[in-house]
């Protein structure tokens, strides 16, 4: 065993990243300067990894062994599989997906109007050009992912209908044993791997978050959460209340407003919105010049990232100015005299939560046309025919939609253990927002809150593939993040600084998350631009990572 120690260290404005240039221009952000934006293992002898899947016979079944198990076949898992296959082509891997097909969110969420809240030039992969409108429907994203799978022969690695129940690490064997239940037969399937790559996302797909308000059982109509929207739900000519005003509500309301009798948005407090055309003028111009799509994708991606960086800096450095500019944009999109102060002026500063992007101002058009209205108040109780508010007003409804967020899922709610000891991630410290102190050979892909989630899929993949190659060079069979002597006296902090980002779903579940230190090695910085430059240069032999 090698005893050396080694370390080295892609919601709505996010949706409007493609359009950030328009907002930046309105905010006078040309003052801000930004830097250029470029964008399974079985040791068969010391330091060598098997390049084929192996089988281990047990008394009850055959256990397949892979170099890597990738958990999830959504946008994170598919991107991870592409990079693993491209950068480490000799490694065997399998993708275990609980659903009956690929796509993750873009398959399980089926409410009307579902679309991205980030532009696809940055939400898409760096290696696969996006060729359509920046804000995409779920069907368009599914087609994009399908093309990536087909073009890179990834289908043969995916096993659908495998719900993972537990994962246990053995230091004696230097491998993970993963137990999954097959959806079609109910049988337990066991696979082993030296490396576990968690790409299952960060919320529970089976259920959304719905607060328990008084009197809900009295309501005689239908209550539904967007995350579990029934395919046969009929909202035509119905009075609809949508509780919530985040990206989901902003997407859903204009999609149903034309057919419903009326839609009322009921919010406890306002959120920020940004609106613009669902097109990218630079991309259109480049295509008119017959510029190859690979170039168009790269150029527009860089432009959008540059604009987003300037917007983020402005919101953090001059929050009052950014707030007024955003509210002025909303005021211009609504009828004269609309009560913007009550309904569209948040209590918090921009970027403390994601900013919802409204392509072509669709929500504001529904409000202006009288198809939708907005009420800012709190619920006192549900009634037989709707809700009574704390102001005393009552809202009637046939259908109530609780667009109230989701439930955070830490590592897919899987039961983990290390050498027989149950693992509680709240007792660990995150290593660069992707690994955990004391947990060997495991990576969690957790994207960005303010930028496109998938940007980090690319960056983490580059880092982990470099780390795997480094393990080969050292003859190491495991890598474990470990606090250095100079880290031991540091204060353990909550996973994210709530002063700068505090969405409700995260606040409800912060106690389940790993901790952080006030050091870049031991936190998720949530800074794409810093990580883009720093992660490729991280010294793997620095001491935070122990290779054995």
Walk through the language-model features, giving the residues of each:
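Beta1-alpha1 glycine-rich phosphate/pyrophosphate-binding loop at the start
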Residues: 63-158, 267-268, 333-338
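Short hydrophobic core segments
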Residues: 71, 191-203, 241, 396-405
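Rossmann-like dinucleotide-binding core of oxidoreductases
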Residues: 62-65, 70, 79-80, 86-92, ...
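C-terminal catalytic lobe of FAD-dependent flavoproteins
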Residues: 328, 332-384, 395-410, 493-548
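FAD-site-proximal beta/loop scaffold in flavoenzymes
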Residues: 222, 226-228, 385-388, 407-444
């Amino acid at each position: 065993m090698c005893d050396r120690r080694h370390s080295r260290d892609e919601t709505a404005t996010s949706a409007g990243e493609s359009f950030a240039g328009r907002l930046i221009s309105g905010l006078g952000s040309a003052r801000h300067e930004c830097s250029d934006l470029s964008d399974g293992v079985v040791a068969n002898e010391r330091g060598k990894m098997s390049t084929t899947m192996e089988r281990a016979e047990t008394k009850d079944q055959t256990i397949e062994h892979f170099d890597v198990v990738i958990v999830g076949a959504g946008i994170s898992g598919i991107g991870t599989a592409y990079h693993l296959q491209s950068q480490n082509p000799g490694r065997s891997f399998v993708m275990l997906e609980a659903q009956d097909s690929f796509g993750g969110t873009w398959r399980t969420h089926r409410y009307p109007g579902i679309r991205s809240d980030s532009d696809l030039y940055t939400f898409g992969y760096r290696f696969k050009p996006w060729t359509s409108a920046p804000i995409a429907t779920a069907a368009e994203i599914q087609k994009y992912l399908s093309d990536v799978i087909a073009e890179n022969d990834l289908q043969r690695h995916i096993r659908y209908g495998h719900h993972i129940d537990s994962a246990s690490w053995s230091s004696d064997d230097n491998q993970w044993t993963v137990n999954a239940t097959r959806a079609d037969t109910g049988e337990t399937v066991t696979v082993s791997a030296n490396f576990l790559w968690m790409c299952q996302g960060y919320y529970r797909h089976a259920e959304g978050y719905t607060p328990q308000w008084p009197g809900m059982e009295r309501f005689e109509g239908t209550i539904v959460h967007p995350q579990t929207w029934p395919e046969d739900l009929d909202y035509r000519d119905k009075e609809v209340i949508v509780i919530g005003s985040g990206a989901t509500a902003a997407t859903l309301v204009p999609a149903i407003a034309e057919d419903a009798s009326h839609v009322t948005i009921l919010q406890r407090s306002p959120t920020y919105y940004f609106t613009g055309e669902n097109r990218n003028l630079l991309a259109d111009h480049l295509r008119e010049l017959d510029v190859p799509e690979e170039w168009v994708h790269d150029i527009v991606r860089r432009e959008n990232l540059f604009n987003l960086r300037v917007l983020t800096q402005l919101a953090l450095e001059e929050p009052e100015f950014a707030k007024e500019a955003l509210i002025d944009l909303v005021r211009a999109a609504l009828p004269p005299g609309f009560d913007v102060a009550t309904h569209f002026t948040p209590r918090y500063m921009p970027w403390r939560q994601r900013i919802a992007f409204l392509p072509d101002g669709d929500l504001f058009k529904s409000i202006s046309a009288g198809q939708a209205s907005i009420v800012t108040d709190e619920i006192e109780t549900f009634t037989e025919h709707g809700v009574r508010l704390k102001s005393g007003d009552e809202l009637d409804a046939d259908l109530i939609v609780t667009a109230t967020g989701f439930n955070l899922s830490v590592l897919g709610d899987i039961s983990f253990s290390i050498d027989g000891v149950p693992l509680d991630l709240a007792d660990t410290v995150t290593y660069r927002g992707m690994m955990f102190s004391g947990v060997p050979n495991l990576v969690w892909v957790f994207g960005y809150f303010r930028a496109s989630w998938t940007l980090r899929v690319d960056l983490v993949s580059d880092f982990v593939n470099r780390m795997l190659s480094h393990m080969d060079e050292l003859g190491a069979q495991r890598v474990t993040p470990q606090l250095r002597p100079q880290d031991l006296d540091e204060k353990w902090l909550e996973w994210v600084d709530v002063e700068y980002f505090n969405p409700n779903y995260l606040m409800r579940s912060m106690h389940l998350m790993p901790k952080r230190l006030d050091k870049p090695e031991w936190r998720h910085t949530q800074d794409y631009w810093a990580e883009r430059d720093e992660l490729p240069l991280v010294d793997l032999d620095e001491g935070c990572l122990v290779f054995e």
